[in-house]
Every structure is written in C-alpha cells, then in structure tokens.
C-alpha cells in the first residue's frame, strides 16, 4: 500500500484554516531522539532562504526566551512549497545594510546554527503561515530590516500543540539541542561555508 501523501505547508495554507495539530505528550517528549536525519542532507534539502527581517509577534523572546527573526511571506516559498509544517534546522546569517548605523558585533555577522518553525504555532492560534528563525546566539540588539540568509538542512519534528507554555519551552530547548547535535556531522558542517552566505 502506498504511503499517504504528506501535504506541504503551502498546500495546507491554500485550504484556509490549518487542521488541528496533535498535542505534545510526556511519552513523546521522553522518546525524542538527540540526532535527526541521515548522515548527509537529502532532497529537498538544502533549501536556501533569504529576505529582510520583519517584525513578528514579539513573543519569542518575551514569552519563550527564544527570540526569532521572521521572514516575509515571499521569502519562505522555497521551503513551504516542498516541505511540511514543523521545526527545521540549519545555518543562518544576518547581513547589515551598507552604511547601517546599528552595526552588529563581529561575532553576530558570522554564519550560526539555527532552528526554524514553519507553520501556524497552534499554541498561539496563528491565523497565517509563518517562518520564524531562532539563531543560536545572544544578539545585543535587534536587526529588523537587515537581510537574513538561511540554509535549511533537515527536519526535526512536526508542529504540535501544548498544554502549557512550560511544555512548549521545554520542547524548544530540546529542538535547539537536537539541531546542534545534528549539525556536528561533517556533511552538515560544510554548509556553514555555503556560497549562499556572505563570507569574508
């Protein structure tokens, strides 16, 4: 019997309201792997994204301790057109505009590990599809309007709903750990110097 086709995020968005997401359970949390994906990225990965950072909902840093950078709708179509909703991992880089009077520090313009949520964030009942990227670095200031480039290398887990904010935060922390572990493999590390990025 053929496996059921998994709808892409763009296909779900075309239907209107997304279907209800499954609720995360204790057994799911305890059974999560610490490394995901094959030994090297497989199609449709790598997926290259870029766009100017937009203001989002402002809750990633405030509510969850996980500040995110939002890409405009047109910038996420290379991913949403081929991938399901859920959490992904890879690398990202923030590039300041020429002459910007809000300069980033030297270690803030490097290519850095990231995790990304693609979906509707059911815990917050979003009404539209978004891609929210968390770069694993403590930036000293915001970078709205700066260019963000990302290379998406793999899938971590499906989009879930949560019984509490604490359960969501715990899963986010696990996502970050899984991403870092998964990116340690040689065939993933080489994408930190991908030609998509601005390398000195």
Question: PLM features: residue spans?
Answer:
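Phosphate/ribose-recognition catalytic cores of enzymes acting on nucleotide-derived substrates
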Residues: 2-200
